[in-house]
Curated annotation (Swiss-Prot):
InterPro entries in the record: Ribosomal_uS7, Ribosomal_uS7_arc, Ribosomal_uS7_CS, Ribosomal_uS7_dom, Ribosomal_uS7_dom_sf, Ribosomal_uS7_euk/arc
Annotated protein name in UniProt: Small ribosomal subunit protein uS7
Keywords: Ribonucleoprotein, Ribosomal protein, RNA-binding, rRNA-binding
PROSITE patterns listed in its UniProt record: RIBOSOMAL_S7
Record's function text: One of the primary rRNA binding proteins, it binds directly to 16S rRNA where it nucleates assembly of the head domain of the 30S subunit. Is located at the subunit interface close to the decoding center.
Cited Gene3D superfamilies: Ribosomal protein S7 domain
Signal peptide: none
Entry similarity comment: Belongs to the universal ribosomal protein uS7 family.
Record keyword Ribonucleoprotein present: yes
Organism: Picrophilus torridus (strain ATCC 700027 / DSM 9790 / JCM 10055 / NBRC 100828 / KAW 2/3)
An example Gene Ontology molecular-function term: structural constituent of ribosome
Length: 187
């Protein structure tokens, strides 16, 4: 039986190179990417939700897209078609590469020592790394399409492609580098 996402993209040959994220990237094949918060009451329930659906949910964060899952689904479907045309690769593999390249490995937290806040570098959990990567990919796409004639489908496709190439022009990759640079200075 083929493992297809959106009824079109095969996920059986997808390779995840980052072993820390491999346990948290879920590519169960669903034709309809809508679990309806089924896993929200379970600890670490996010692990059971398909990564593509989590990307859809991150797209619905702004006031323009709130509650419009079908519109977000249409945008993602068209973005995947653009990615497939431009790269001649499976867009799910390109997305996984983008997630691996834009997931920060360490960040800064604030510790208080006698009333003084001191920044301290800490490792990031794999679940948070995945959330940060998906969020930054979506923020980069929506910010580039805001007050622009370029449709969000193209912006999302370009953001995914740039992040998969580890290009500094990608919002997600530049944000990751910024977070890691601040963490390196706080060691």
């Amino acid at each position: 039986m083929d493992r297809l996402i959106m009824g079109k993209y095969d996920v059986s040959g997808i390779q995840i190179h980052d072993m820390g994220l491999a346990k948290y990237i879920n590519l169960n094949s669903y034709f309809n990417l809508h679990t309806g918060g089924r896993y929200s009451n379970y600890s670490a329930g996010k692990r059971n939700v398909n990564t593509i659906e989590r990307l859809l949910n991150k797209l619905m964060r702004t006031e323009k897209w709130t509650g419009k899952k079908y519109s977000a689904y249409r945008v993602l479907k068209e973005a995947f078609e653009i990615v497939e045309q431009k790269t001649k690769q499976n867009p799910v593999q390109v997305l996984i590469n983008a997630i691996e390249n834009s997931a920060p490995r360490e960040e800064v937290t604030r510790l208080k020592y006698g009333g003084i806040a001191v920044p301290k570098s800490v490792d990031v959990s794999p679940s948070r790394r995945l959330d940060e990567a998906l969020r930054n990919i979506c923020i980069g796409a929506t910010s580039k399409s805001f007050k622009s004639k370029v449709p969000i489908e193209e912006c999302l496709a370009n953001e995914i492609i740039l992040a998969s190439r580890n290009d500094g022009n990608s919002y997600a990759v530049s944000k990751k580098e910024e977070i890691e640079r601040v963490a390196a200075s706080a060691r």
